[in-house]
Amino acid sequence: MPSGSMSGGVSGPTSPPHPTVPSRPLRPSRYVPVSAATAFLVGSTTLFFCFTCPWLSEQFSVAVPIYNGVMFMFVLANFCMATFMDPGIFPRAEEDEDKEDDFRAPLYKTVEIRGIQVRMKWCSTCRFYRPPRCSHCSVCDNCVEDFDHHCPWVNNCIGRRNYRYFFLFLLSLTAHIMGVFGFGLLFILYHTQQLDRVHSAVTMAVMCVAGLFFIPVAGLTGFHVVLVARGRTTNEQVTGKFRGGVNPFTNGCLRNVSHVLCSSQAPRYLGRKRKAQTVSVQPPFLRPQLTEAQLAAKVLDNGIQGDLHRSKSSLEMMESQSADAEPPPPPKPELRYPGLSRGPAGHSEESSLLNKAPPTPTMFKYRPTYSSPGKNHTALTHAYANQSSQQPGYRSEPSLDGREGGGAERSGAERTGGGPGGPPGSGIPGYSLGGRSYPSFSDPTVLAERASRSSSVRSTHNAPPSEATTSTSYKSLANQTPPQAARNGSLSYDSLLTPSESPDFESAAPEMSPGRPRTPVVGYSSPFLSAQIAHQREAELHQPVASSSALMASPQHAVFLRGSGSPPVPPERERERLLHDSQAQHHHHHHHHHHHHRPPRFSRPPLLSDSGPPQPSYPYRTRSTDTTHPPRSPHPPPLGKSLSYSSAAAAEMQYRLVRKASASVAGGGIQAPKDEIQMKSYSRTNGQPKPSSTPSSPTHPISVSTRPGQAHSSAGSSQSPAHKPGGGVKKVTGVGGTTYEISV
């Protein structure tokens, strides 16, 4: 029977002949149905030929026994083929084949056949993923290709290789049963008077057997005719795999029938004689190297082919990408300013620097990201922040030296590499971090001597961005507002504290620099008042005689003189005196408010350049030495940032302190009411700046401490009654009912 014929397997070079299919135990009950079917088929047909066919051949034709004989032989042949033929058993995986897939393999794999997802299940017995339409027979204990069902009447599984014979067996058996029953009925009709005879009794017995088997066989035949026409198997029909969808294996009725009856025989996977493989073992006893074709692709768990080997360069690139935690820099901005014209002689160096793409400094990966008490902001790269720091001269950082006075000194510092991008070549001791050199400024005498040079060098180099430029670029990035649309935006805290966006400032800037057109500059920049507006307001408020000349020598005036190419430069002594006065005045304010710390009521989020210890606003910044100093020290204490990271807000603070010093000499305490007028007059209405007819002084600077819970007010209590030790809060209502509370 089929048990002996199906015990073959795949034989290795030194393995037993059939190791893949284990020998099944002999169970007599398995052979009962097939034995009964064989007995009824052969016995009834033999009786029919012995007792009925001779009379039929004599009375009607010799073709009757010939027809029945051919049909019986066809039935018997198909029965034997369906019983003894291999249905398409897949050999089981050997141990060395499935050891890498058995434990980590998922339960299912999904493949796509004609656009339809078909699931392949993992067979734990055979240890491989069963192909589509394959199933494991529980009786035969084998995975059968195109499994239809296990037929007990033939004692074999019906699969791809023997389904044709099983189907033909059903068809021929049905026809044979009908022929036997019909010809037997014909014999009885002619011998109704002789029913007691042996021939009539045997013929009626054969008719009873044929009639008994005709109903189930005819029903099974009709069922399989439908399955063949629809291109399905019994297993698919019973389990209902394609009951509510489309069968991807059907090719139409005619093609399905022709595929079952006329297709070529499927190959057999068991019992193949394989040649012995000779493997040459090398001296280190290593496995032979696999070829590229063997390593080309492997079907992954989801059915997708993936490459198993990667080149060395791709692995190194993946390792470098995983090791580098710094995000990639944004695309380089095209630094073009509409309507910006530079002088042909004095501005060639700055124009070339503006056209260069801002580099991403190495210090960025060592600087911590900023955090806010209530918000989480995206980290800002220096490539984006440098865009706002490379603004035109009349909006860039202030400098204490003029074009003529500092030109040679700055060019000498650039040649010797004294800028932030090179080593300190001007005789200033410094330190190096991340490939960049930074001066340390431990001598107080060097501090005052190098202050003006630092501002000019810093404004012309591609240094890391300052605090003010980082603040403005951070705000523009956080608001996601382009520079053109920012002019028409809603009321913001920047417009309240930045009077530089008013029409007066836009019109006054070209007057101070006649070489530039009147086109307003696009984008945010450091909020500074022009020197001319400051001079007019100071004259209207206090009419000082001495302070006007002092204000014209202020650092902000020096910036506009540099931008317009004007020759007047404050002398060295006057500049040192202004530095000394502003520092002493700021020391007075700083120590006066030292014991009145309170949490900021309205402050901007800390930036990348704000991380570290709290920094009072000074005209320049040096490296921190963490040493205490007397309140009346002629030089300010060093701070926790290098020279290249000094901010424009510090220069703005110096400029306002010089203004306050001159205002305190001339006018006294009338500045606070004007501050409130100025604060409200430069607010925006419907996105447009609204100038005020009343001239006012600059706003009080609000210096925000980076320590949580502390804020230092930089305005002294002697300047205005609004700046008392207890402090106060200004409330400004904007468009849409938004109320801004500003700590002063």
Swiss-Prot record:
GO terms for biological process: positive regulation of pattern recognition receptor signaling pathway. Residues 398-413, 571-584 have a biased composition (Basic and acidic residues). It is an enzyme of class 2 (transferase). This is Palmitoyltransferase ZDHHC5-A. PANTHER family: ANKYRIN REPEAT AND LEM DOMAIN-CONTAINING PROTEIN 2, PALMITOYLTRANSFERASE ZDHHC5. The lineage of its organism: Eukaryota, Metazoa, Chordata, Craniata, Vertebrata. PROSITE patterns: DHHC (PS50216). It catalyses: L-cysteinyl-[protein] + hexadecanoyl-CoA = S-hexadecanoyl-L-cysteinyl-[protein] + CoA. InterPro entries: Palmitoyltrfase_DHHC. Residues 369-393, 460-501 have a biased composition (Polar residues). Keywords: Acyltransferase, Cell membrane, Lipoprotein, Membrane, Methylation, Palmitate, Phosphoprotein, Transferase, Transmembrane, Transmembrane helix. Its EC number is 2.3.1.225. The chain crosses the membrane at residues 31-51, 62-82, 168-188, 209-229. Residues 1-25, 314-523, 556-645, 664-744 are annotated as: Disordered. Coiled coil: none annotated. Residues 121-171 form the DHHC domain.
